[in-house]
Amino acid sequence: MKNLLDLEHKLNYYFNDRNLLKNALLHKSLGNERKEYKNQTNERLELLGDAVLDLIVAEYLYKSYKNASEGPIAKLKAMIVSEPILAKISRQIGVGKFLMLSRGEVMSGGRNRESILADSFEAILGAVYIDSNLDEARVFALSHIKQYIDHIEENEDILDFKSILQEYVQKEFKTVPTYELVAERGPDHMKEFEIQVIVGNYKEKAVARNKKKAEQLSAKALCIKLGVKYNEAL
């Protein structure tokens, strides 16, 4: 087995009880192959780590998106804690070469299998939680997953910008935004809609494949123009 200190460097976490890290890396295939490892596999730590990760990510999103409803937050959370993302984190760390697998699992490519890598990251997080506390586990998890949260945030619609804009405009301008269809372009199966939102002398346009999306995009653009603070982390 590779030097665990090397892995701790990459994890940026040093265990008080390194046996926890060993257990987090011990796959059930080896437990099935060798009886002495049967009760030391990472499945229990994986279960715990899964719950800890759910809490950490849900808490982060709750604090970061004050104006988002439950639905978009749940969608974003599911994407962040998904198997492909967790496997990518494990690959980036290099977890695969430290895994304790059965010979058959090694021969079949287990060190690079997405499901095994994702489960292993959850098991390591569970081990960090047991070895320290929730605060340390939170720092550990976010240090590895934050870049993926940022990437997903940039490419997903999380906030209801129409509601945010309306709330702001009612408070500051004592009116409500109006939306108008500027143009429709393209054939029926690839139609695009250009929508303009108007608040007094302020106007912004956006184009999308459906009217609701175009309205959201135009509202977002006007929020930015007006300096609306719609995504403040606590």
UniProtKB/Swiss-Prot annotation:
Belongs to the ribonuclease III family. It catalyses: Endonucleolytic cleavage to 5'-phosphomonoester. It comes from Fusobacterium nucleatum subsp. nucleatum (strain ATCC 25586 / DSM 15643 / BCRC 10681 / CIP 101130 / JCM 8532 / KCTC 2640 / LMG 13131 / VPI 4355). It is an enzyme of class 3 (hydrolase). Digests double-stranded RNA. Involved in the processing of primary rRNA transcript to yield the immediate precursors to the large and small rRNAs (23S and 16S). Processes some mRNAs, and tRNAs when they are encoded in the rRNA operon. Processes pre-crRNA and tracrRNA of type II CRISPR loci if present in the organism. This is Ribonuclease 3. Disulfide bonds: none annotated. It is found in: Cytoplasm. NCBIfam families: RNaseIII. It holds the Pfam family Ribonucleas_3_3. Its cofactor is Mg(2+). The active site is at D50, E122. GO terms for molecular function: double-stranded RNA binding; metal ion binding; ribonuclease III activity; rRNA binding. CDD domains: DSRM_RNAse_III_family, RIBOc.
